[in-house]
Design a protein with these regions (language model features):
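Conserved acidic
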Residues: 1-148
Length: 148
């Protein structure tokens, strides 16, 4: 919905791609080949991820805690550096030259992110609001007339 609008809020998912890696165990070590585990986490494009064997989700968890600590200490430089490191995991996994490149890893991140944005849009619209824009990790919601 192009144009300039009043009363719009932006709902931004905090570190969406790192959150997906952490929550859904998207990790080269966790990528299941051969026998399928009963309780595997389903990814996309054939990706299945172990609930027990992984590295990146733990690294991201540690970085997340460190970033929250940096923010609590008003250390914006460190907080931003940690954010860049966390986001770089997705970038590295999506690089063909990376030793751990596998299209199932990146598609399990991007397609899960897309699914989350679409589900959020549907939820918001079911509540009677209009989503006027969405991107990789946020949606813009038109609130309509707001009484002063």
């Amino acid at each position: 919905m192009p144009g300039i609008h009043d009363n719009v809020i932006v709902l931004d998912f905090k570190s969406l791609y790192p959150s997906i890696i952490r929550s859904f165990h998207v990790d080269p070590l966790a990528l299941i080949e051969g026998l399928i585990e009963d309780n595997a986490i389903e990814g996309y494009d054939g990706g299945l991820f172990s609930r027990d064997k992984y590295i990146l989700p733990e690294l991201i968890e540690d970085l997340w805690v460190a970033r929250d600590r940096a923010k609590a200490n008003s250390n914006e430089v460190l907080s931003q550096a940690i954010k860049i490191i966390m986001n770089s995991f997705y970038g590295v996994l999506g690089t063909i030259g990376c030793r751990f490149f596998d299209s199932r890893l990146v598609s399990s991140i991007t397609k899960r992110g897309h699914e989350i944005i679409i589900q959020s849009k549907e939820y918001i619209e079911d509540k009677g609001y209009q989503v006027i824009y969405g991107d990789t990790d946020s949606v813009f919601v038109l609130l309509g007339d707001v009484k002063k």
